């Protein structure tokens, strides 16, 4: 069992229940899933780039990614419908908690020139999205074996109804928001 999950159950639930005056523990927001997405537009010309991106995402998440395909053709980007253009992973349960712990304690502090995460990146319904410019902040990625520095999108989906509740949930885990 991940330490953060135990911490959530034992401490965070009680804090948030008191702060927002919930009548039931089931009303307290929780993290539902974490989605990692890596767009690889250059995969149109070199298929090996997509394979390397899949390998990176597998190492980061511990789960095999789904290859995403273009929904429609766009002549300006020279893509046709059905072309593979990226990969994504949805983490839930145990793997989600382990990834969240690694993200907060190891990966985010390794971001170059890090001054905190933007607290305005909530979507209006308590979900938080952030972008990472380099996949090498994760300790699972070996810097010497990286063919190209790629970024990825990380979306933390919560059951919170408002941004304030979502921010309080993530702040309870010492999520490094910018002051």
Swiss-Prot record:
Protein name: Large ribosomal subunit protein uL5
Pfam families named in the record: Ribosomal_L5 (PF00281), Ribosomal_L5_C (PF00673)
Family: Belongs to the universal ribosomal protein uL5 family.
Purpose of the protein: This is one of the proteins that bind and probably mediate the attachment of the 5S RNA into the large ribosomal subunit, where it forms part of the central protuberance. In the 70S ribosome it contacts protein S13 of the 30S subunit (bridge B1b), connecting the 2 subunits; this bridge is implicated in subunit movement. Contacts the P site tRNA; the 5S rRNA and some of its associated proteins might help stabilize positioning of ribosome-bound tRNAs.
PROSITE patterns reported for this sequence: RIBOSOMAL_L5
NCBIfam families: PRK00010.1 (NF000585)
Keywords assigned: Ribonucleoprotein, Ribosomal protein, RNA-binding, rRNA-binding, tRNA-binding
A GO CC term assigned to this protein in UniProt: ribosome
MF term (GO), any: structural constituent of ribosome
């Amino acid at each position: 069992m991940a330490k953060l999950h135990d911490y959530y159950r034992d401490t965070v639930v009680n804090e948030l229940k008191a702060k927002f005056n919930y009548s039931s523990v089931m009303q307290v927001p929780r993290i539902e899933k974490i989605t990692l997405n890596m767009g690889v537009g250059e995969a149109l010309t070199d298929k090996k780039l997509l394979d390397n991106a899949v390998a990176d995402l597998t190492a980061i998440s511990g789960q095999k990614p789904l290859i995403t395909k273009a929904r429609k053709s766009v002549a300006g980007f020279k893509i046709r419908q059905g072309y593979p253009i990226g990969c994504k992973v949805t983490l839930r349960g145990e793997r989600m908690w382990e990834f969240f712990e690694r993200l907060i304690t190891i990966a985010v502090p390794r971001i170059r020139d890090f001054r905190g995460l933007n607290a305005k990146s909530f979507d209006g319904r308590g979900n938080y999205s952030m972008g990472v410019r380099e996949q090498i902040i994760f300790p699972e990625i070996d810097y010497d074996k990286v063919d190209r520095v790629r970024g990825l999108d990380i979306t933390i989906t919560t059951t919170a109804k408002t941004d304030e509740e979502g921010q309080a949930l993530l702040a309870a885990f010492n999520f490094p928001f910018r002051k």
